[in-house]
From Swiss-Prot:
Protein name: Protein RecA
GO biological process, one term: SOS response
Binding site residues for ATP: 81-88
Organism: Mycoplasma mycoides
Leader peptide range in chain numbering: none
Length: 345
């Protein structure tokens, strides 16, 4: 290292030391904490917020694509896509995972379409799920705010943004113009809710639908409902689309859905994954586990043969699923092993 470069580094270190020991800075920090409370200003490297708290999405493949092992706590998440693409099912799986951890979840059913039996099929304890079916958009957002302010809810799902119709529009005539009412309502609400969500550490999932913009010749004509505020305030945006049917002896038993992480403020964005949703079962968790065990080389695959710790399991993916099903403890141990590897990636 040259003498000139060494002197420059030493001078920078001296200036940095003087800055941190500055009497004026210490007084300013003291005054800020006095006025706004302890923790209102902090050193990022010494902050408790350095490590993002998460909970599983219910899909190991999606947890992997999210980059932090699941959904972040205290953030806004938007899940959008065409109709019948699996958006609500994904959200219900998130509720199930929160309940497994002993947390409390709520579902704001603006579409008035939640099926209790389907929730139970996915593993949700419906006796511990709070549900609201609001009359209009303002009422839904007021209920959302009150639940967040309780500081007792871990996850709230709003289904859907498209169904959050402003009261003015509902009370008016069919011929009345209502351009921009919903967008203004969402923008006003989210400016306030964003801070409350972070403070309460509540995760809020907004389910949204796609619409086509009129007159678009070049570029993508598709857009989400509710204006641009939700796009801005969301930490994660997931685009969900149906990819193909899952067949068993020519019978359709489910769908494969492609998920793209369009926005991610917590990790690398634009990752994609494809997960399987089975009818009356939801996410094919064992199938995902098998794929990840092979991907991380925990289970070895040679041709059609699978083996674990030098012991042959059998031929084909189905034999591995049967091998896992035979021992619940084995499933739990290997799942935890995969989760640790996902967080390390």
């Amino acid at each position: 290292m040259s003498t000139e470069l060494q002197n420059t580094i030493e001078n920078n270190d001296i200036r940095e030391s003087q800055m941190w020991n500055s009497k004026e800075l210490k007084e300013a920090i003291k005054e800020i904490e006095k006025m706004f409370g302890k923790g209102s200003i902090m050193v990022l490297g010494q902050s408790d917020n350095l490590n993002i708290e998460t909970f599983s999405s219910g899909s190991l493949l999606l947890d992997n694509a999210l980059g932090i092992g699941g959904y972040p706590k205290g953030r806004i998440i938007e899940i959008y896509g065409p109709e019948s693409s699996g958006k609500t099912t994904l959200s219900l799986h998130a509720i199930c995972e929160v309940q497994k951890l002993g947390g409390i979840a709520a579902f704001i059913d603006a579409e008035h379409s939640l099926e209790p039996k389907y929730c139970q099929t996915l593993g949700i304890d419906t006796n511990k799920l709070l549900v609201s079916q609001p009359d209009n958009g303002e009422q839904a957002l007021d209920i959302l705010e009150m639940l967040i302010n309780s500081n007792s809810i871990d996850l709230i799902v709003v289904d859907s943004v498209a169904a959050l119709v402003p009261k003015t529009e509902l009370d008016g005539e069919m011929s009345d113009q209502s351009i921009g009412l919903q967008a203004r309502m969402m923008s006003k609400a989210l400016r306030k809710l964003n801070w409350l969500i972070a403070k309460s550490n509540t995760t809020v999932i907004f389910i949204n639908q796609l619409r086509e913009k009129i007159g678009v010749i070049f570029g993508n004509p598709e857009t989400t409902t509710g204006g641009k505020a939700l796009k801005f305030f969301s930490s994660i945006r997931l685009e969900v689309r149906k990819a193909e049917n899952i067949l068993n002896n020519y019978e359709i038993i489910g769908n494969k859905i492609k998920i793209k992480v369009v926005k991610n403020k917590t990790a690398i964005p634009f990752k994609t994954t494809t997960i399987s949703l089975l009818y009356n079962k939801g996410i094919d968790k064992l199938g995902e586990l098998v794929d990840l065990l092979v991907s991380y080389e925990i289970i070895e695959k040679s041709g059609v043969w699978y083996s674990y710790q030098n012991e042959k399991i059998g031929q084909g993916r189905t034999s591995v699923i049967q091998w896992l099903n035979a021992d619940e403890n084995r499933i739990n141990e290997l799942t935890e092993q995969v989760k640790k590897l996902i967080k390390q990636d």
